[in-house]
Design a protein with these regions (language model features):
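Right-handed beta-helix
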Residues: 1-13, 70-79, 83-191
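Conserved structured core elements
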Residues: 18-22, 70-73
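Structural detector for short beta-strands of small beta-barrel domains
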Residues: 20-34
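Short aromatic-glycine-enriched beta-strand elements
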Residues: 35-43
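Catalytic cores of peptidoglycan-degrading enzymes
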Residues: 43-49, 53, 76-80
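Beta-strand/loop nucleic-acid-binding surfaces
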Residues: 49-70
Length: 191
């Protein structure tokens, strides 16, 4: 009986000694997945030193045939690496982490933000009750409960429940007709 207990303990110790459970900080080294599955490679210093892990599968919020959540970090970004069933040959990347000062703006608990490397930004702002899509070079679309505003340089189109306004009211299109230059000329709809 003692040899059975010893044998079981020895196998258990060996299993624990060669298993890696939990999350480990990694740094992305390659995102050019030859299988096109959103896998990446990373260094995981706490486990592998400076050696890269194998191709890590994504732990995506959802994925299926031809649909899902697709966002890959760039090379040099911080990622969390796990190992399926604790095995080093089955890496998984399950998210990212920011170093000090790397978090994108805006920084609020009520604002959800997706920012690309080139600054293209999607903002869900519960604080201001608006949704905003901003191109990295400046043009933007802003939506609230009562209006949609498209801005590109000095040009602006504002759509409300009652009218469409171009360039801060220089042209207005509404149910009653069209007005130009703040009322200088009006084309109405016959009564």
């Amino acid at each position: 009986m003692d040899s059975l207990v010893e044998n079981t303990l020895e196998r258990l110790v060996n299993r624990v000694a060669t298993s890696y459970f939990g999350k480990y900080r990694g740094v992305v080294t390659d995102v050019d997945d030859p299988n096109n599955q959103c896998r990446l490679r990373a260094t995981v210093p706490a486990v592998l030193g400076e050696q890269e892990c194998g191709w890590a599968m994504p732990a995506s919020p959802f994925a299926g045939d031809g649909h899902g959540f697709v966002m890959l970090p760039k090379v040099g970004s911080g990622v969390w690496i796990e190992f399926e069933a604790g095995r080093l040959d089955n890496p998984i990347w399950s998210g990212g982490w920011w170093g000090s000062g790397e978090r994108p703006d805006p920084q609020s608990a009520t604002v959800r933000v997706i920012v690309s490397e080139k600054g293209h930004t999607f903002i869900l702002d519960d604080e201001s009750d608006e949704v905003k899509l901003v191109h990295g070079s400046g043009p933007e679309i802003k939506m609230t409960g009562s209006e949609i505003v498209l801005t590109c340089g000095a040009c602006e189109i504002k759509i409300t429940n009652e009218n469409i306004s171009l360039n801060n009211g220089l042209i207005k299109v509404g149910l009653a007709g069209v007005s130009l230059v703040n009322g200088a000329m009006t084309f109405g709809v016959p009564p």
